[in-house]
Every structure is written in C-alpha cells, then in structure tokens.
Amino acid sequence: MDIVDVLPLDAAGAVIVLWAVLGLLGLIMQRSPRLITNIIFPAGALVSLALAVTGLWALGEVASIAVLPLGLPDLPLHLRLDPLSAFFLILLGGASFGVSLFSAGYFRSMEGNTLGLLCLEYHLFLAGMALVLLADDAYMFMVAWETMALSSYFLVTTDHHVPDIRKAGYLYLLIAHVGAIAILLCFGVMQGGHGISAYTFDAMRAAHLTTFWASVAFLLALFGFGAKAGLLPMHVWLPEAHPAAPSPVSALMSGIMLKTAIYGILRITFDLLGAQQWWWGVLALALGLLTAVFGVMFAAVQGDMKRLLAYSSIENIGLLLVGIGLTIIFHVYGKDALAALSLTAALYHTLNHAFFKSLLFIGTGSILHATGERNMGRLGGLIHRMPWAAALMLVGVLSISGLPPFNGFVSEWLLLQAFLLSPGLPNSYINMLIPVAAALIALAAALAAYVMVKFYGIIFLGQPREQALEHAHDAGIWERIGLGWLALGCVALGLAPVFVIQQLDFVTQLLIGQGLGNSASGWLFLTPVDTERASYSPVFFLLAVLGVMLVTSLTVHRFYHGRLRRGPAWDCGFPAQTARMQDTAEGFGQPIRRIFEPFFKIESELPSAFDTQPRYHGRSDDRFWFALYLPIKQITEKLSSWVSLLQHGRIHLYLSYTFVTLVVLLAFV
C-alpha cells in the first residue's frame, strides 16, 4: 500500500474546506438552532485548533506550494505556506478557537433563520482570512480578501433593521473597498506590465522594480492595508463597526482581521519588494506613533465599552506599525540584530493582541448579554454578580496594560529595548526622531494602563448604577471555556517568551535574514541582546510576587493573629455612599479631555441657573471626521446633485449621450 505524505498546506486547505462545509450545514440546519450552537460552533472551534496545530507544524518547515486547476486561463490559483503564513495561521486558529467556543453559548438566544445565515457568514469569514494568508498570486489574494470583507460586512449588519447599524456597515464596506482598490493598484505596479502570468508572487519577487516604482507600490500597500488595519486617517470605521457587530464578530475583526492587514504590509514590504528605503521606515514609524497616541487618547474619553476597545485596537495597530517602521530603518542601515529585535517585538505584539483583545471583546459580550447595556456609566459592581467573567477579563486587562508577567509586557518591553539599544545612525534626523518616538511609546503605554483602569473599575467595581443590574447573571459554560482559553493564552505567552521567540526566529529569518538566536539564557531568562544590557524572567518575577504575598500573609498571621477585627472604616462623618457618588466613565476621562483638548472636538451642554433637575451633557468627537470625511461627503453629494441633472427622463437625450460617447471612443481609442 502506497503511503502519501501529507503536507502542512494540504492540512490548511482541508481546514478551509471544513469551515465552508460547517457554514453550509449551519444554513441547512437553521430550523434547529440548538444543533447549530451545540454542534456546529464547537466543531468549528476544533477546526480552528487544527489550523493552529498546522501552523506550528509548518513554522519550521520549508515553504510548500500548490497550483490549483482553477482561476483565469493564464493564471491558475497559487497557494503557498511559509513561516510567515504559518505564524498568522497560528494566530488565526488559536484566537478563533476561543471565540468559536464562546459563540456556542452567546448565540443561543438568536432565532433560527438569522442564526443559520450568521453561521454561514461566520465560517466563510474564517475561511476567507485563512485564504488571504495562503494566497500566492494577486488574483487569489483579492478573491480571498473580498470574501473576508463581504462576509464581515454581513456579520457587522446582523441587526440590519437598526438604521445606525446599517450606516456603520456601509461605512466599513466603503473604506474596505477603497483600500482594496489601492491594494489592486499595488499589485498592478509590482506586476510591471509583463502580462497576466506576472501576477504571481514569485514573478513579483523577481521583478526588481526601480526605486520609484517600488516606493509607489509601498505607499499603495500602506494605504490599502492601512484602511483595513485602522491606521490614521482611515480609522473611522472601527469605532462604528465594532459596537454594531455581535461581540464574537468584534473579537474576530479586532483580534484577527486587522492582523491580515499587518500580514499584507509585511508580505509586500519584506518579501515581494525586496530592498527597502530608509524613508519608508520613517513614514511607517511616524504614522504608527500618531495612530497609537491618537487611539489611546480617544479610548480614554469613551463611555461605550465597545467603542473604547475599538479605539484601543487603533492604538495597538499603531504600536505594530512602529515596530515595522523601526525594522525597516535598522535593516536599511545594516543593523540586522536590532532589526530582528524590533520585528520580533512587532510579531510578538501581533500575537498578544489577538489573544487579549479577543478576550476583552467577548468579555464585553458576556456583560452585554447579562445586562443589555454597553454604556459603562450605567454599569458597576458586576464583580459580585459575574465573578467568572470578572476574573477572566482581569487577565485581559492586565495583559493589555503591559503588566508583568502577562503577555502584553513582553512585546512592549522588547519594543522599548529596540529604542533604547538604538545605535547612532548615519541619518541625523532619524537619530533625533527615535528618542521622541520612544517617549511617545512610553506615553501611549501609560495611557493604555489608565484606560484599562477606567474600563475595569467602572464596569466591575463599586456599586451597581442601575437597579436592573441586580439581576445580572454570569457567563455560561461555553462562554467561560472560551474566555478561559484566551486568558490561558495570555498567561502562557507571558510566561514562556523564550519559546515564543525561538519560533518567531523562523519568520524573521525569512523576512530579513536575521533572528534573535542568542536571546535566551537557559529557558528562564530572556536576553534580547546580551545579559549586560537587559534581561527578563517572567517566572522569577511571578515567584517573587507570590513570595512577597506569602511572607506578608504569614507575618500578619504570626504577629497579629487574634488581634485583628473587621469593622467600618472611619470616614469623618461621611453619610452612606450611594451609586451616584461614584466616579463615572465621563468623569474618569475628564483629565485626558482637558489636557489634550486640541485633539478633540468637544461639545457640552450646561444646565441653566434655575434648572430644577440639572444635568451636564458632553461629547468628544473625532476631528478627522469633521475635517476630512464630512467635507468629502458634502462634495460627493454636491457632485451627485449635478449628475442628477442628466437624469431627466427624456429618451432622445439619452440616445444622444450614447451617440456622443461612441463618436469619442471611435476618435480617440
């Protein structure tokens, strides 16, 4: 009997087919919603886990390539699985495993017809993202990209009967397709006019574009993928689409879909284009800094918990672009060790963000499911009614805040190390920019922790701000398992950075020919450059914290046992506290709103002097919307009104339009 070798690419292709089949089964079984939630979504989760295992399998392997007998006459579909694709498949499979398990419980209350269609869209969305990561020609890539975009649009507009949700979906689809046009133009530039067969990625690698055309391709890629990732100023769809979408969909979009754009930037910049220019890195670094600082500032003043997380995603995407920009700069100037360090930091943070942001988004789904409320100003005290959700979301909050020993600290620490270890470069302007960039990254990290204190404290601590919260219930069993898996991922990625970086070396070796091979001193200590400069051991840190807590507890019980008593604290005659006396989400963000006032468009309404029920109302709007997008909208409406003059209903004039067009084409074409 012949034994057929199964390649990782074969396994990844089988996963995509299984997701599509599960989606179709969900549509067929729409009259049995319990079967969809109890069988289809858990099965989809197992398929996700299989994809993550496939990615781990392929990470250290030689790239595998397949040509399918489908596509255009002279351009069959090409698939490729290399270490870069494998890394993002691990991210996709690992994060979607937890989200799919959570979805099995979250969507139980949805009606059968809607649930069946959502199940199809959900699994097509996953399949589309996987195909994006495996595509090895422009045609296959754009087909997968559009599959991902359209399926996510339909997921965002699940509750399409709500006008605001339809508007959010339209805005998302519009910006997604503007970005897709830029990506298509980028592929056209890299194809170099050599026929349809040159649209394969192998042909683009061998094209050797001039500096001018390579720069044009890079700018188009940065704009096109930046629109999907939420870079300034194409970020406006995120805070609209995420609140509109069901929470598991928000988790997939923020935790995974945004990373497909990062994948696209990495693939084109370091793989397809080959040599880079120093100013590409400066542009990416500056744009990333602006995106990170702007995103975290706006997150600080949000009252809607899902909008807050959406702006937080903008901040984290900015951090990723900062790492990519640093990598380009160091690589161009031959500082390959530091280029590997900054690229490793960016890749590590990409993986970390997939886990902790997915965890936080599905956690807000549990809160929304239990309370029916997204406004943090109406929540509070939920730690007593939702202890499981509170404990697991605390892991995500500590991770995104960059506190050791959780995963967010490792990637942010590596990024700061890349700044701190930066040598003198031949370009004096870059030498001046890097310290400023490091300071802004530190500011963004501090503000991110501030935002998460607000997020967790307002929602879970204190007293309930509404009477209805007394009846809130904790997450169900499927939801707890999904939350627990993602929380476990945050802890594991934080405690085992040496193992993670050893796997990331396969990716950095592919992209820049350099890894952090000597980044470990044993398996306990992470030393990015050498032990004399910086080292970090999350296990020792955790043991030290636990040791201090243990010694403190033993000391208290040894010397004060029997003399401790519990009682109300003396509060200087302060009366009984009510829920209205607590800090609000708006009040917590007030210092940021005032300090960075020029960045916001602030509108406020103050009560009159004789108002018997005075209330203060304020809002902080995005200046980009009013300065950029609103004028574009007004110009478009004006042009449309002029074009409408041609739509007068007179047939003979319509025929004359056709005749004039034909004459022009015959004359000039």
Name every feature range the model reports, one short phrase each.
Residues 22-23, 49, 95-96, 187-188, ...:
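Hydrophobic core segments of alpha-helical transmembrane domains in multi-pass membrane transport
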Residues 1-14, 24-120, 193-208, 506, ...:
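Transmembrane helix-loop-helix hairpins at membrane boundaries of multipass inner-membrane proteins
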Residues 64-73, 200-206, 337, 411-427, ...:
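Membrane-interfacial helical/loop segments at transmembrane boundaries in membrane proteins
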Residues 499-547, 554-669:
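Aromatic-capped, Gly/Pro-kinked transmembrane alpha-helices
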Residues 5-14, 77-91, 131-143, 278-283, ...:
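Membrane-entry segments of alpha-helical transmembrane domains in multi-pass membrane proteins
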Residues 42-56, 176-187, 393-405, 483-505:
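Hydrophobic alpha-helical membrane-insertion segments
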Residues 79-93, 211-225, 429-445, 522-549:
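Hydrophobic alpha-helical transmembrane segments
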Residues 98-141, 151-475, 497:
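Hydrophobic transmembrane alpha-helices and their helix-loop junctions in integral membrane proteins
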